[in-house]
Amino acid sequence: MTEQATAAQIKSMEELVSFLSHPRPELRKSASSLLISMTASDQSVFQLLALPKLDVVQALCRVVSDMRPIAEDAIKALINLTAANPTACERALKYDLLNRVMTQVEDSEWRLTDYSMMLLANVTTTPEGAKELLGYDAKATDATLALREKKIRTLTNAFLESEPEPEGVDAATGDAKWDDEYQYVANILANISQLEQGRAFLLKMRQNTSLVGALMPQLKSPNVVRRRGVAAALKNLCFDSDNHFYLYDQLDVPTNMMLLLAGPEPLDEEDKLGMNPVVFSQGDKKKREQDRQVRLAAVDCLLLLCTTRNGRKDLRRKKVYPIIRNAHLVEPDEEIGDQIYKLVDFLIRDEEGEEPDWNDIRAKSFASDQETKTGEDGEVVKPPPQSKAPEPKKPEPKAPEAKKQVETRVEDKKVKVPASSTSPAVVAEDENVSDDFAGQMANEMSALDVSSDEEDDDVDVD
């Protein structure tokens, strides 16, 4: 439980914050360094944000453009504050932090891009932050929207053109560490995909392709932060049924999700008919995605695509079932196993009912401010997918689960990735499945112990 600060503590903290505006740079540096340590504690964050006379967020925003050592400390402290409390995100927007940071990263001499991206990822976990990044604020004009779109596109191009470089192994978790200053762009894209305008931005066609199409290869990135963010963004796109045809027909999202879920298990020739050869071409050398958040997002994408009749037909045609059947047999995570059950049930049964009200689904899915702190390992999107910055180390974000927002703490290495919205309850529509296909599925289902005779099951993608 968070304790209220004593009068002496409040006075001491206010004096510390006041030093951020002192004319002597060495005093500003000392104050900013101390604030990094303080903001690593949730209790201190609460007390700092509750100061009656001084606004710590405003004071830190002012020195973001200070000399590099001071600016670095300020950004790290803001990462911690915005990861811990949405109020800090709101205040940061009030003091024009987004424009300050976006201007800095455009400077080729700027050397704090990784921290800047982490801070942007945290601030955009809130709907207000995502809207402001896209330029949809109260003062939006066609010109400002076009300019902001250009800036985000520039960041995305830098993300796509850069390659993560190995940087050893995290002693605490044993996970690989990466020198990848644009990795948190994946979190940012996952965060904006919670909004209709953000999804439109990702789907907008440019030079015969969309941005999300260009992002698909990142699902194979060795950096889990990138994989989590892109997987979370794809899940958010799958919540709009209007996008489904483009996602499964033009981008072949089902095959890309199958690639994540496929393992070394052999497949019968009959199972391979209709399946993209890339899924089984590696044979017993194929490795299944090891990150839980990415696997969950992959299953959720397939489940959401199953909420339309044509989507179910496409998944059957591409032979999704054999892949998820094998994945289920070795899946250690109970939540993912439950989602596979629901997916299998959709693929094998005759369904009755009407299509869901997707407007209602979107309202429920994206209205809640559910924020999920990512696991301590890869740190990002969930998923899509806020950060706290560590003093001595480079922060490693945590990836968002597909449904919550992304936060990161640099010190704790926690990153929140906007998780996509909660999954809709879906009533399946009338549909005919061949007797042979249904019989084959039913036999295999007995091994999974999945019930397929309930007509009114809800589909929840949590």
What are these regions (language model features)?
Residues 30, 59, 73, 91, ...:
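Alpha-solenoid helical repeat scaffolds
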Residues 1-15, 23, 28-42, 266, ...:
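Intrinsically disordered, low-complexity regulatory regions
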